[in-house]
Regions:
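Class I S-adenosyl-L-methionine-dependent methyltransferase catalytic core
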Residues: 1-134
Length: 134
C-alpha cells in the first residue's frame, strides 16, 4: 500500500531460445529459467503464472485508489492466438481491480521470414491496461 502508481511490464514472449532475443528472455526469465520453473506444465501455463503473480504483487504495493499500469501483448503459440491482455484483465477483475481504460499502441509490422502461408492474424499492437486499486 505504498505507491500511488505502479507500472508492470511482464514477459509475454512465448518463444524462448536461440536468437536475437536471448538476452531479453534471460532477463525476463522466459528462457531456460522458465523451462526449469514450469515442471510438468506447459510453457504458456508457466508464463501465465508469472503474469498473474506479477499483477498480484503490483496491486499489493499500490495504495487504495492508486493505479496499476500493466502492459500486455498477444502472441502465437502452436498456431493459436495467445491473448495475454485478456488474461490480465480477467486476473485483475478477479482480484477486485477496476479497469479504467485500455490503450492500444499500434506498430508498423516488420517483414517476417517466409515460413509458408500466413495462418494466423498478425497482432502488431501492445495493450496498456489501466487498473484502479480498491
Amino acid at each position: 500500500n505504498t505507491f500511488g502508481l505502479t507500472c508492470f511490464d511482464p514477459p509475454y514472449v512465448l518463444k524462448g531460445g536461440a536468437g536475437k532475443f536471448d538476452d531479453m528472455n534471460r532477463r525476463y526469465g522466459v528462457g531456460a529459467e522458465l523451462t526449469e520453473r514450469r515442471g510438468e506444465r506447459s510453457r504458456k501455463e508457466a508464463l501465465f503464472d508469472l503474469v498473474e503473480d506479477g499483477l498480484t504483487e503490483a496491486a499489493r504495493i499500490t495504495r487504495p485508489g492508486g493505479w496499476v499500469l500493466a502492459k500486455a501483448g498477444r502472441g502465437i503459440d502452436g498456431g493459436k492466438l495467445v491473448r495475454t491482455d485478456d488474461l490480465m484483465v480477467r486476473t485483475g477483475e478477479d482480484m477486485g481491480l477496476t479497469v479504467l481504460t485500455t490503450l492500444l499502441l499500434l506498430s508498423r509490422p516488420r517483414s517476417q521470414a517466409h515460413r509458408g502461408p500466413q495462418k494466423t492474424p498478425r497482432a502488431n499492437f501492445s495493450t496498456l491496461i489501466v487498473f484502479e486499486v480498491p
